[in-house]
Amino acid sequence: MWKKTISLMVISACMTGNVVAQGIVDVHCHNILPFYLEALEKHDAAMDEGFPLPAWDAGAHLKFMDEAGIGCSILTMPAPQPYFNDTEECQQTIRRYNEYCAKLKADYPGRFRFCASLPLPDVEAAVREAIYALDTLGADGVKLATNCRGQYLGDEELDPLMKVLDERHAVIIVHPHRPTPYSEKIITTTPLAMYEYPAETTRAVVNMLARNILVRYPNLKLVVPHCGSFLPLALPRMKSILPAMVAQDYMQPIDWEANLSRLYFDLAGNPTPEVLHSLLTITTPDHILYGSDYPYLPDAVLKANLQRLKQMLAADEELAPYREDILWKNAERLFEGNAIDER
């Protein structure tokens, strides 16, 4: 059976009252590499998401992690997908990115991990890259965009990729990308990250649920970003309408329990108590993970966000028992079987 072992080194434990604070695991952060940015600039796509991509380097990221008390960061490629109607160029950029991340993982053991990018919308190329990244490079999972030039998660054409990932018990980190197609008039007044990203994430996950992807491929685990996006609002409506849709043969039945049991949710986006409790209407505390969204906000802002989250968890009677789980233990369990070892 295909297995791999991950060892996440956590920072030294320190006592905070009666709580042992372990190194936090950050499941939502990005590294913007020079050759990736060059590929975007070549096609005038560096501003495709409506805002400039921030600078990144390993030293600055490690400094932030040390100051914030983060033991391990799981890196993913940001948006946009480097595909501009040239499959070979996309494959080369993504292969270079994955190999760079594998070297980072080797150079900084226990500090950096990565979920590989795949050269979608070319499904055959994505299957090849997934096998190489997971089997040879030691990727800790894969990152999938909500859509790649209009090819959405849950679409039937992605089934061969889902099969390969399922065979490897892969963790999939989802990240929103610009919707395709889209209206310029809709997104000119607000950045994509403000509204359209949560809508895009919700759209993609609903598409996967509607096709029972996580039931048909039961070894997959999916990390949904930004506090579940709009799913806490969308799922009750979807559940209420589904029986009528099934009765008229517009949709198939959905195994809600099985699907939702394979969804995990990161807290990137500075969650409030209201947001967290809304998220708990569709999941349980053992499926909630810390995410910073580094480096898209200044270090000081991200550290303040994390401090507020810690205080909020400590003060919340329902969530206080799960403080360490949310900050790092749930990430260990998520990658279990890829067993994250505590040191």
Feature roles, as predicted:
Residues 51-56, 82-83, 119-126, 149-156, ...:
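Acidic-and-aromatic substrate-binding clefts and catalytic sites of carbohydrate-active enzymes
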Residues 7-18:
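Bacterial N-terminal signal peptides
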Residues 25-29, 73-75, 113-116, 142-144, ...:
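Hydrophobic faces of well-ordered beta-strands that scaffold small-molecule active sites
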